[in-house]
Design a protein with these regions (language model features):
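Compositionally biased linear targeting/interaction segments
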Residues: 1-256
Length: 256
C-alpha cells in the first residue's frame, strides 16, 4: 500500500511541476490536499511537504573534472551559519575540510582534513574508510571527528543530505521563522533581524522572482548570495500515517 502511495505522490508532484517548476508556494494543492485512503477498520493519511528548507551538507562540494572540490559559496554560507552558534573558527574549518575529504576521491588531506589513514587507524573506532561519495544521511556526519566537537542539535535542526550537490539553495516560499538562520546564511548582507522580518511579512502566496522579492523588501540587500535563490523545490517528504483499529504506524519517504 505504501508503495502505491509513493507512486501516487510522484505522479502528483510531476503534474503540479510539469508546467511551472520555477514557482511553488505553500498554497499549492500539492501541500494542501492530503491523500486519504479508507480501510476496513482504519485509514491511511499521507501528506507531501517541502523538504528543501535545510542546509544540504553535500552542497559543500562541487563536481570538478575528476574529483569533488570545495564549493566556496556554500562554505561561506556554512561559516555564517556556524557563527550564529559561536562555533570556534578552527572547528568550522576542520568540519569543512573533513567533510570534503570524506567525499572526495583522493587520499590527500586538506589543511584541517582527514583521510583513510585516520579513519582506518588506531585512533578511530570503528575502523572504516572515507566514503568517496556524497552523504546519504546526516547521521553519517557523526563519524566526522570535528562534527563531534559541536552540539549535534545544530546539525539535526538545520542540515540534510540530499543527493544533489548543487549550490546551497532552498525554496524561499517554504521558509518559516525557525529558518531565519538559514535565510541569513544565504545572503551576506542579511542579518538575523532582517531574515526574521522577511519571513514574517512574506506573502502566503510566496514570490516568483528575485525582482518581486526585492520590491517587497526594498531596504534589504539580496546581492551576491552564497548560493542559488530558488522559488520552487525538487526535494519532498512524503509522510504517511496508518490507523488500523488500535494500531498506529508512520512511514516517511524522501522524494527527489
Amino acid at each position: 500500500m505504501f508503495r502505491n502511495i509513493e507512486s501516487l505522490a510522484l505522479k502528483k508532484i510531476d503534474i503540479e511541476l510539469r508546467f511551472n517548476n520555477k514557482y511553488l508556494s505553500q498554497e499549492n494543492p500539492l501541500f494542501v490536499n492530503d491523500f486519504v485512503f479508507e480501510l476496513d477498520n482504519g485509514k491511511i493519511v499521507s501528506k507531501i511537504s517541502d523538504a528543501s528548507v535545510c542546509f544540504n551538507i553535500n552542497s559543500i562540494v562541487a563536481k570538478g573534472d575528476n574529483n569533488f572540490i570545495e564549493n566556496k559559496k556554500s562554505t561561506q554560507a556554512f561559516r555564517k551559519l556556524m557563527s550564529y552558534y559561536e562555533v570556534d573558527n578552527n572547528i568550522v574549518e576542520e568540519i569543512i575540510d573533513q567533510v570534503i575529504d570524506w567525499i572526495d576521491y583522493d587520499s590527500n588531506p586538506r589543511a584541517y582534513g582527514l583521510e583513510d589513514y585516520y579513519y582506518s587507524g588506531p585512533l578511530n573506532n570503528p575502523k572504516e574508510y572515507t566514503g568517496k561519495r556524497l552523504f546519504i544521511s546526516i547521521n553519517e556526519l557523526k563519524g566526522i571527528p570535528a562534527i563531534r566537537k559541536i552540539d549535534w542539535n545544530i546539525i539535526d535542526d538545520h542540515f540534510c543530505a540530499n543527493q544533489q550537490n548543487d549550490n546551497f539553495s532552498f525554496n524561499i516560499n517554504s521558509i518559516e521563522l525557525k529558518d531565519a538562520y538559514l535565510l541569513s546564511s544565504l545572503f551576506p548582507n542579511i542579518d538575523i533581524s532582517d531574515a526574521e522580518y522577511i519571513i514574517t511579512y512574506m506573502p502566503e502566496e510566496g514570490v516568483q522572482t528575485l525582482t518581486e522579492l526585492s520590491k517587497l523588501f526594498p531596504s534589504r540587500d539580496f546581492n551576491s548570495p552564497n548560493g542559488m535563490i530558488s522559488f520552487s523545490s525538487s526535494s519532498f517528504l512524503l509522510s504517511s500515517k496508518i490507523t488500523f483499529e488500535n494500531y498506529i504506524s508512520e512511514s516517511f519517504s524522501n522524494i527527489y
